[in-house]
Regions:
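Histidine-acidic metal/acid-base catalytic patches
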Residues: 1-4, 12-27, 150-253
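Structural preference for beta-strand elements that scaffold enzyme active sites
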Residues: 2-7, 30-32, 61-68, 100-104, ...
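Active-site beta-loop-alpha junctions enriched in small/polar residues
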Residues: 6-10, 34-38, 69-72, 108-110, ...
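Short, N-terminal intrinsically disordered low-complexity segments that are rich in Pro/Gly
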Residues: 9-13, 43
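Active-site acidic/histidine proton-transfer and metal-coordination neighborhood
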Residues: 14-17, 21-24, 54-63, 73-170, ...
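N-terminal substrate-binding region of glycoside hydrolase catalytic domains
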Residues: 27-45, 68
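A generic structural signal for short coil/turn motifs at secondary-structure boundaries
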Residues: 40-43, 114, 178-181
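Glycine-rich, positively charged N-terminal anion/phosphate-binding segment
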Residues: 42-58
Length: 253
């Protein structure tokens, strides 16, 4: 496995050149770029920037792990769902142009007026449509285990079963909540999603989440991808990232 970062908070104000230089300096090997932040990798970016972005990542040795979108498919209003599917397809096209491995999407809640099983199926079918577009473009879809109620691994399992597309995987999100961590362990919840895991977010490694168990289970499942730090910003990002990498490496021992 390798250490990377999500620019949701840490790194969000960095332009792409600064971000890649900081990652290279601190030993971070992969990046998920949160969209709408300072990096400039967005829908509508000039086509001339596509190759430039791809080259910048290639020259840096840092992998563009994914584009972190807020596309979601749980809405009751089907027009909203359709709009999110079509926007996901646009992100997929951009990901292919700039050399990103994947596109991160999410569930973001479960409407109370709709049966959970129906919403899970709706999300899964939307993911399957996006998965076909992703396969055609040579990228992946990463479904983040996210949202109130919808982050329950049992529900995400239902979404993935309804999806059933090889280009769609799960982004394990290291949620320290009772749906995921049971009696201090993820031994019963991790297996629900392990066969689909294609990405992984990690948070503050100083928290009481079972980090050693997570890293062991990831390795045992055959996962050899990035574990992406999604942590608060710092006035000294490079200094924080060095300490974070040291702690991450200690957990691998």
């Amino acid at each position: 496995m390798k250490l990377g970062m999500v620019t949701y908070e840490l790194g969000k104000a960095m332009d792409l050149k600064t971000l890649l230089a900081t990652c290279r300096e601190t030993g971070f090997k992969a990046v998920e770029l949160r969209t709408t932040h300072a990096h400039g990798v967005e829908l509508g970016m000039p086509e001339a920037k596509w190759a430039e972005t791809k080259t910048m990542f290639a020259d840096s040795g840092v992998e563009l792990w994914g584009l972190g979108t807020v596309c979601e498919y749980h809405a009751v209003d089907q027009a909203v769902v359709r709009r999110n599917i079509e926007q996901t397809k646009q992100w997929i096209e951009l990901a292919a142009h700039v050399g990103a491995r994947g596109v991160k999407v999410r569930p973001n809640g479960m409407p109370k007026e709709v049966a959970q099983e129906k919403t899970c199926e709706q999300i899964g079918l939307a993911l399957a449509e996006c998965g076909k577009a992703a396969a055609d473009a040579g990228v992946l879809i990463h479904l983040e285990v996210h949202g109130a109620v919808s982050s329950n691994p049992k529900l995400c399992q239902k979404m993935m079963e309804a999806c059933d597309h090889p280009s769609v995987g799960v982004c394990w999100n290291s949620n320290n909540n009772p749906d995921e961590v049971i009696n201090g362990s993820i031994a019963t919840t991790f297996p629900l999603l392990s066969k689909w895991i294609k990405s992984c977010h990690i948070t503050e490694l100083s928290s009481n989440y079972p980090w050693r168990e997570l890293f062991r289970l990831l390795k045992e499942s055959g996962y050899d991808g990035a574990t992406l730090a999604e942590i608060p910003a710092s006035a000294e990002p490079a200094r924080l990232m060095r300490y974070y990498r040291a702690l991450w490496e200690a957990y691998q021992a």
